[in-house]
């Protein structure tokens, strides 16, 4: 769960930017998009293959 605490002198805009950054780094939206539709075994294999290639490059 992503949480952002707003400081006393902090504007809501900067807190919202921090929240959006945390959500994008955690990959929540990517998971939601992936789980929105049924994934065939071939698609799952291709996705995992891409993840392995990306991890190997790092």
Swiss-Prot record:
Gene3D superfamilies: Ribosomal protein S8 (1.20.5.1150). InterPro entries: Ribosomal_bS21, Ribosomal_bS21_CS, Ribosomal_bS21_sf. Pfam families: Ribosomal_S21 (PF01165). The keyword Ribosomal protein applies. One of its GO terms (cellular component) is ribosome. GO terms for molecular function: structural constituent of ribosome. The keyword Ribosomal protein applies. GO terms for biological process: translation. This is Small ribosomal subunit protein bS21. The lineage of its organism: Bacteria, Bacillati, Cyanobacteriota, Cyanophyceae, Synechococcales.
